[in-house]
Structures are given as C-alpha cells and as structure tokens.
Amino acid sequence: MPELPEVETSRRGIEPHLVGATILHAVVRNGRLRWPVSNEIHTLSDKPVLSVQRRAKYLLLELPDGWIIIHLGMSGSLRILSEELPAEKHDHVDLVMSNGKVLRYTDPRRFGAWLWTKELEGHNVLAHLGPEPLSEAFNAEYLKARCAKKKTPIKPWLMDNKLVVGVGNIYASESLFAAGIHPDRLASSLSEQECEILVKVIKAVLLRSIEQGGTTLKDFLQSDGKPGYFAQELQVYGRKGEPCRVCGTPIVASKHAQRATFYCRQCQK
C-alpha cells in the first residue's frame, strides 16, 4: 500500500502539470472503487486546478468550487501522460487537462477512492486524523503523552492514524529499527528519551524515502512511471532471515494486527 512518502512523491510529481491548467473533462471508466466515484467528478468541466495538497495519505485537488479527494488504496497510482495514449484494463479515471496532458488513475485492486467535497473541514475521511509526522505538532512531548496509558504494542499504535498519519507498515518497521525499539514493547513503556529518538527517526526515515521517490515493492510507481528507490535502503522490512546490516543477526518476521512486522532481536529492545 502506498504510504506517506509515496503519496507525497505523487503529489510533487503531478503538481507542476495540474496547477495553472484547467480540467476540460473527466473520463470515468470504472467508478466502482472502495467507494463509488462521486457524481460531481463524472461531470467535471472547465475547472482550473488551484493547488495540489496532501493530508495523510489523501491527495487534495483544489478547484474553485470544491475539492477532489484521491486515495491510492492498496495498489493505485497516478501518472501524467499525453492525451493520445490509450487506456489499459486497470486505468479507471482520467482528468483531461487543457495543456494536452492527462492525469490517469490506475488501480488493479480498486481499493482507492475519488471523492468530491465542497469543504475539506469536517469531511468524514479527514475529520479524525492525527498530526502530520513531519510537522512540529508531532514531537516527543506529544508522543509521550499519547503513549502514557496505551497498553498495546508500539508498532500497531504508530500505524494508527489517530496518533499520527501516514506511518504505515514499512516505515513503522524501519523507524522502530532505527530507534532500537522492539515492536512488541508496550507503548506505555517508552521513556521520554525513547520518544524523542523515535520522533526524530520517523521524520528522518520519511524524509529520506521522499528524497528517494518512495518505496517500490510491487505496485507503486511515481507519476512519471519510474519506481521509487527507497526499497534499496530498507534495513528490516521484507528481509526475513537475512542478516541484520548492523549486527548480522537474522531478521525476524512476526504478525501485528494481521500485518507483517520485521525486526532484529539483537538491535531492538
């Protein structure tokens, strides 16, 4: 599933081609996504794009009279293409632009979403989200306070969007390794110093992944069709049985809330 770095990479890739251009019309080939494509998107016509923003894993296209909310789901991607390039089987939505480009949404598993809203504030998919991990609001004091009475393992708690947005399975595993914290540790057991370290490494890991264009494991591609390269730097995720790059101990895989977790028994306590 695309996580925050992949969505931010997509945002940065499509923004220069959309802002300042006008959506001439939309082509919805298959509107049966996680939720049905909003009716307003089917009928888009002559709408200039004012900005391309991101909140958590949602891309937000600002138009004069409302917002398009896009979620990439499990396998979705956005590409900027020339208008004449024919659509393929899993190309479900196009925005045809005035500059001769097309924003094409591809989603083999159809778990993504294309929604419309007049106002972002209070929309049900955005209303209960925690702070952005790269913002000043996500700091050691905040994390310590939110962990203080939490009797659940730290790994799934980091992946809870009510705590902090966009830290999915890959980056939770990588951040806990970088912080030296075992994923089975109860959130309430983290010290102030550990919270400070964890916040710093989460920010560093996410920023590094954004610089590398995200992590390509199976489905994710950047808006230009190229893969993300952070997968080449993964320390634990997807490396079950391989030697830890720090100490040589074989990487262990386990399950948390039905999600694979990877860690080093020696380096993480």
From Swiss-Prot:
Zn finger (FPG-type) start-end: 235-269
Catalysed transformations (reactions): Hydrolysis of DNA containing ring-opened 7-methylguanine residues, releasing 2,6-diamino-4-hydroxy-5-(N-methyl)formamidopyrimidine; 2'-deoxyribonucleotide-(2'-deoxyribose 5'-phosphate)-2'-deoxyribonucleotide-DNA = a 3'-end 2'-deoxyribonucleotide-(2,3-dehydro-2,3-deoxyribose 5'-phosphate)-DNA + a 5'-end 5'-phospho-2'-deoxyribonucleoside-DNA + H(+)
InterPro entries in UniProt: DNA_glyclase/AP_lyase_DNA-bd, DNA_glyclase_Znf_dom_DNA_BS, Formamido-pyr_DNA_Glyclase, FPG_cat, MutM-like_N-ter, Ribosomal_uS13-like_H2TH, Znf_DNA_glyclase/AP_lyase, Znf_FPG/IleRS
Cofactor: binding comment: Binds 1 zinc ion per subunit.
Record bears the keyword NAD: no
SUPFAM superfamilies listed in its UniProt record: Glucocorticoid receptor-like (DNA-binding domain), N-terminal domain of MutM-like DNA repair proteins, S13-like H2TH domain
Organism superkingdom: Bacteria
EC number(s) stated in the UniProt entry for this protein: 3.2.2.23, 4.2.99.18
Pfam families named in the record: Fapy_DNA_glyco, H2TH, zf-FPG_IleRS
Signal peptide: none
Keyword list, A-Z: DNA damage, DNA repair, DNA-binding, Glycosidase, Hydrolase, Lyase, Metal-binding, Multifunctional enzyme, Zinc, Zinc-finger
Role: Involved in base excision repair of DNA damaged by oxidation or by mutagenic agents. Acts as a DNA glycosylase that recognizes and removes damaged bases. Has a preference for oxidized purines, such as 7,8-dihydro-8-oxoguanine (8-oxoG). Has AP (apurinic/apyrimidinic) lyase activity and introduces nicks in the DNA strand. Cleaves the DNA backbone by beta-delta elimination to generate a single-strand break at the site of the removed base with both 3'- and 5'-phosphates.
Family statement: Belongs to the FPG family.
Subunit structure: Monomer.
Protein name: Formamidopyrimidine-DNA glycosylase
Organism for this UniProt entry: Enterobacter sp. (strain 638)
Native organism taxonomy: Bacteria, Pseudomonadati, Pseudomonadota, Gammaproteobacteria, Enterobacterales
